């Protein structure tokens, strides 16, 4: 290698190892970031699309795990979903930074190494990329971008066990339903914005679910590691969330929600995480949101190993 080439290479090196920036990333940028991570860490990552949005954008899922490409006996399946309301954008960036954190700390951080070795972690940063494209930063309260391109709220679009949901199933919803059916997910959470609370099932019934103690425990496990959420009074106009958690229906009823669909139809426990008072806050706040949620997102994944794990084989 010549001296000139060496200097060029050294000049490029900081760009190659530069940390992910704290800003919002559009769909093209998000795709490029995921493909770059996959190319740099091929042994422990897998990137796939579960379908397309109304406008044809891919719904990318990024997998981190020692066995990333397929289910392995004894390795539980975990998922995080963000940005199903397109204008609720913080969770989208939290998941990108979580990916970076897992990859860059694998084999150097004992907790991360154990998680990646013993868990198959699926991350869907944007369930509603069309809505995200239609929304704008610093919009805290409007519904611009909340819905998919066809005008449907994706968190009101799933089958509901408590009352019939007659809305046509949207492409994004269908893709997620197919994804859930194709994997044996055990634990999940989906990210939202507009409040600071961890919400658990049921969303559309005041009936106490059979696993109520487990659901409350999981919600509090996330909340107690996020001091802003746990304080229960972080957002103006919100109060009464003891320890930063709430039953979904007690807060407000949701028909056709993804949380209940996971739990009732697929035996996958899911909680809903409201992680920012402002739905689409200024990008300058993103590093703070990552710092607030970093411990929680790791601690919550660890809970997939709580209790007994069984694999049933039918011959």
How would you name each of these model-derived features?
Residues 67-220, 224, 228, 232-236, ...:
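Active-site/substrate-binding loop(s) of hydrolase catalytic cores
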Residues 266-308:
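Catalytic cores of secreted or luminal carbohydrate-active enzymes
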Residues 2-19:
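Cleavable N-terminal signal peptides of Sec/SRP-targeted secreted and luminal proteins
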Residues 246-266:
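Short glycine-rich, acidic/polar surface loops and turns
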Residues 26-29, 167-172, 214, 285-292:
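Soluble or luminal CAZymes and related metallo-dependent hydrolases
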Residues 307-315:
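A short, amphipathic beta-strand motif
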Residues 16-22, 80-82:
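Acidic/histidine-rich, surface-exposed loop or edge segments in extracytoplasmic proteins
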Residues 22-78:
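Soluble metallo-hydrolase cores and metallopeptidase-like ectodomains found primarily
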């Amino acid at each position: 290698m010549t001296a000139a080439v060496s200097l060029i290479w050294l000049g490029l090196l900081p760009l190659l190892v530069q940390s992910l920036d704290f800003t919002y990333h559009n769909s093209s940028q998000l795709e490029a970031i995921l493909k770059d991570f996959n190319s740099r860490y091929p042994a422990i990552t897998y990137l796939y699309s579960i379908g397309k949005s109304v406008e044809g954008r891919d719904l990318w899922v990024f997998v981190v795990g020692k066995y990333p490409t397929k289910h392995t006996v004894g390795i539980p399946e975990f998922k995080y979903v963000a940005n199903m309301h397109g204008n609720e954008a913080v969770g989208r960036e939290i998941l990108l930074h979580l990916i970076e954190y897992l990859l860059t700390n694998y084999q150097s951080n004992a907790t991360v190494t154990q998680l990646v070795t013993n868990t198959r972690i699926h991350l869907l940063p944007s369930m509603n990329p069309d809505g995200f494209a239609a929304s704008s930063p610093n919009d805290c309260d409007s519904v611009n971008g909340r819905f998919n391109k066809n005008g449907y709220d994706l968190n009101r679009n799933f089958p509901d066990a408590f009352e019939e949901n007659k809305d046509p199933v949207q492409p994004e919803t269908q893709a997620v339903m197919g994804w859930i059916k194709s994997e044996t997910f055990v634990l999940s959470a989906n990210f939202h914005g507009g409040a600071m609370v961890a919400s658990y099932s049921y969303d559309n019934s005041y009936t106490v679910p059979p696993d109520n103690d487990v659901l409350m425990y999981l919600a509090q496990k996330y909340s107690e590691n996020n001091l802003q959420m746990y304080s229960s009074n972080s957002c103006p106009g919100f109060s009464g969330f003891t320890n930063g958690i709430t039953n979904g229906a007690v807060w407000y009823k949701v028909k056709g929600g993804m949380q209940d669909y996971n739990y009732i139809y697929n035996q996958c426990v899911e909680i809903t995480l409201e992680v920012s008072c402002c739905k689409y806050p200024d990008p300058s706040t993103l590093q703070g949101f990552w710092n607030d949620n970093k411990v929680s997102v790791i601690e919550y994944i660890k809970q997939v190993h709580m209790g007994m794990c069984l694999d049933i084989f039918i011959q």
